[in-house]
Amino acid sequence: MKKFFFSLMAIALAVGTTLSASADNRTMPAEVQRLHDEIRAEFAPDKRVATFDVDYTFSDKNVMLRGQTTSIEAKNKLVITLRKMGYNVMDCIATLPDEESLNGKTLGIINLSTCALRSAPEYSAEMVTQALLGMPVKLIERDGWYRLQTPDGYLSWSSRVGVHPVTQQEYDAWNGAEKVIVTTHHSFAYKEPKADADVVSDIVGGNRLCYEGEKGKYFKVSYPDGRVGYILRSEAMRESEWRENLKQDAESIIATAKSLIGVPYLWGGTSSKGVDCSGLMRTSLFMHDIIIPRDASQQAYTGEHIDIAPDFSNLQPGDLLFFGSKATATRKERVVHVAMYMGGKRFIHSQGDVRINSFDPEDELYDPYNLGRLLFAARVLPYINKQPSLNTTATNPFYK
């Protein structure tokens, strides 16, 4: 067996017969391709929240498996099934998180007001989402940058300055500490409790810092990395008070969305500095302690599906509206945009900037383009904490 392993390794390195399991692969054994697709569909159907990337190197009935996955169950099922199919398997699949590259610290706390999270570990890569200061995350691997998973399940890459790695004990201490919640859209934390003091950092709505006391008009707060700052009490609330006053009704959430009118569209943005369409939904809801999936195509399959009547009479304020292209005989339905219904045929969304438009031809805000690509709606508010992907910081496992 050892001889086989060394021989196969030589083949892999010298001959280069590695095959990736992709839909258009013509040389992968059909039975292996089917198995790969079945396992991916079961354990990692959405690559934005789970990874199952495996390359196969074949020599007759010998196969070397290389790659990585976030699911040990997927890896085990692949190896066991291949062996049952008669293959001699050399398993070199890495299971994430990669504790070795992370030096054992597989948890972290976001350390910037708005941390840009990218599709690859480099500044030139696409920004796919953002994370907010104080947000707990899971660290997956380190390659100069940190690959991490946010509380909505999204996988992405952060620069080292964006996240503070912690032990389980430090993570639990952070989650258990009394917080100060930033409630203004944008401001600053200062080194001293006065407006002309030097700045520690900027802050945005939804940021969470540890409560360390009060001095005059200021909260004293601490950061994940131990820095200390002062935030105006008029721009934040203690978490206990914030929870007592928390409102999760449609009217309050729509008011928060309206307070972002004019904020520029930013691809990948999920903060008051800039939002994309789904980022506006996520930001507006998160300010009311509601966590929803990141992208419009993920948000579309939460809550209760609502078919839209011609007169829009079956819609309620707070419903999410989804836009895109309808299914055809050769193409699946595709969701590319999301908005929030306000009532009276009006909706708020981010397209160029955050704005209000209408489905009513008699309304000065009439938007025929989006009316023409309207698909369906989803009613999410009644399903908070009743569906796995709709939760709050009180129930989401990342915050425990």
How would you describe each model-predicted region?
Residues 110-133, 182-211, 265:
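Beta-loop motif signature
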Residues 165-168, 187, 194-197, 237-240, ...:
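Aromatic- and glycine-rich peptidoglycan recognition patches
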Residues 5-9, 13, 17, 21-130, ...:
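N-terminal targeting leaders
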Residues 64-68, 240-244, 264-272:
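Second-shell loop/turn segments in exported
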Residues 265-279, 283-317:
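Catalytic cysteine-centered active-site loop
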Residues 76-101, 122, 150-184, 194, ...:
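Boundary regions of SH3-family modules and the immediately adjacent low-complexity/disordered segments
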Residues 64, 75, 128-159, 201-233:
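SH3/SH3-like beta-barrel superfamily modules
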